[in-house]
Amino acid sequence: MGMRLSRRDKIARMLLIWAALAAVALVLVGCIRVVGGRARMAEPKLGQPVEWTPCRSSNPQVKIPGGALCGKLAVPVDYDRPDGDVAALALIRFPATGDKIGSLVINPGGPGESGIEAALGVFQTLPKRVHERFDLVGFDPRGVASSRPAIWCNSDADNDRLRAEPQVDYSREGVAHIENETKQFVGRCVDKMGKNFLAHVGTVNVAKDLDAIRAALGDDKLTYLGYSYGTRIGSAYAEEFPQRVRAMILDGAVDPNADPIEAELRQAKGFQDAFNNYAADCAKNAGCPLGADPAKAVEVYHSLVDPLVDPDNPRISRPARTKDPRGLSYSDAIVGTIMALYSPNLWQHLTDGLSELVDNRGDTLLALADMYMRRDSHGRYNNSGDARVAINCVDQPPVTDRDKVIDEDRRAREIAPFMSYGKFTGDAPLGTCAFWPVPPTSQPHAVSAPGLVPTVVVSTTHDPATPYKAGVDLANQLRGSLLTFDGTQHTVVFQGDSCIDEYVTAYLIGGTTPPSGAKC
């Protein structure tokens, strides 16, 4: 959320929300901070055990389930310099109610999303048998949410300003303007966080943090559930500590071996497929704002959203009316649409939003965009957007070849026309990572984890954010089991599908992997 978004940044951001469960969790949890029960928890020191205390919420309207415990764990910022700077990881734990096997540690991905908020959501739907046998544990990765230091680059005003602008001018002057905004964003990150911390926020270090959490919980081996980009954390842990894994479920896979540009284009195709599926469903109903012919849905969609940009100057916004004084910008109309495409449970909200836009009103799409961008009713953002950029930029090599970026823009316009404004100009801005001040700590590679126990990768056939093939590829690399879900949402474990939950519960408790070809 934060800097001027190039097409590459927009596509990369599509991993933000993890399925219908996340949509529910966001409504319930929002941008709260969950901390230990004392008014001010002292920051822990290296080597200290976690001091667990009853959790409390910064939002009085959000009730934390009874028995939830919170604490912090100190880890070195740089594991090669354990006497240097320290980070404090925020944790939440829901104790097992029966004969405990160990801890089930979860992460929702993003990257940059709060594992504490995710645990609050998963706790509501966790099967009773799993709750009996495991402590449910969530953690905010280094730099994220309630962990300290947290990555902050933009102010709330910065985010509102950037969202208000169309971000579609790919003329030579427009590209220069976008890249100047990007450089200013990078400068804010360096000024506020320092290069040393930014150099150590990547998943390679988060995997080491995860092992420190395992040890602090008293577990000899890790039992882990990762959603979306949380699968990247899981596969990194499996590579670094294959002998310390008891069980691992990876749902909505990110393939560490994927070429970054090709992965982004596959994500773009996934969202175009989701848009097409939505349009076909909408067309069955009288009054569909995209009309009765799904083949014309993209054309009709652009007739609704393109007028939000001044046709004579694509850097000028012509926002739709909203009760909020901000209005609905073109950028937020696209983001609100993407938010609704994560799950069919949100399609009716997209229909409502597009129906409003017919009358130049934008309240529903703005609300969806605010949910996606993590802006609360008081105009405050959490730090997930800034954290996501910082993590992505050290997790993969930057694309600095402008010819490749221009070719990606051309291909993306063909693959995902609903997200594409105007015509191909033959120019495109470099993404944020091209200007990042520290080098990446990881490169695309196939996962190698000799001695790893059987794992379970869950992949959804029409997942808009993490394509099905990524799950197939990751399962092959891990030599694990592939569990297929036939659906259109992003991630599925512990979200109400009894078939999926039976398979993963049997695996978590007894180690029984799904049979070859298992499908729900």
UniProtKB/Swiss-Prot annotation:
EC number: 3.4.21.-
Cystine bridges: 55-70, 153-189, 282-288, 393-433, 499-520
One Gene Ontology MF term: carboxylesterase activity
Effect of residue 31 to A: Cannot cleave GroEL2
Main location: other
Loss of function: phenotype: Disruption of the gene leads to growth defects and attenuates the virulence of Mtb. Disruption of the gene enhances host innate immune responses, compromises the intracellular survival of Mtb in macrophages, and increases its susceptibility to lysozyme. It prolongs survival and reduces lung immunopathology of infected mice. Disruption leads to earlier and significantly higher levels of key pro-inflammatory cytokines and chemokines.
Stretch forming the signal peptide: 1-30
Covalent lipid adducts (S-diacylglycerol cysteine), residues: 31
Keywords recorded for this protein, A-Z: Cell membrane, Disulfide bond, Hydrolase, Lipoprotein, Membrane, Palmitate, Signal, Virulence
GO biological process: post-translational protein modification
Active-site residues per Swiss-Prot or TrEMBL entry: 228 (nucleophile), 463, 490 (proton donor)
Residues lipid-modified (N-palmitoyl cysteine): 31
Subcellular location per the Swiss-Prot or TrEMBL entry: Cell envelope; Cell membrane
Subunit structure: Interacts with GroEL2.
Family statement: Belongs to the peptidase S33 family.
Further comment found in the protein's record: Hip1 is an attractive target for developing immunomodulatory therapeutics against Mtb.
Protein known as: Serine protease Hip1
Organism this protein belongs to: Mycobacterium tuberculosis (strain ATCC 25618 / H37Rv)
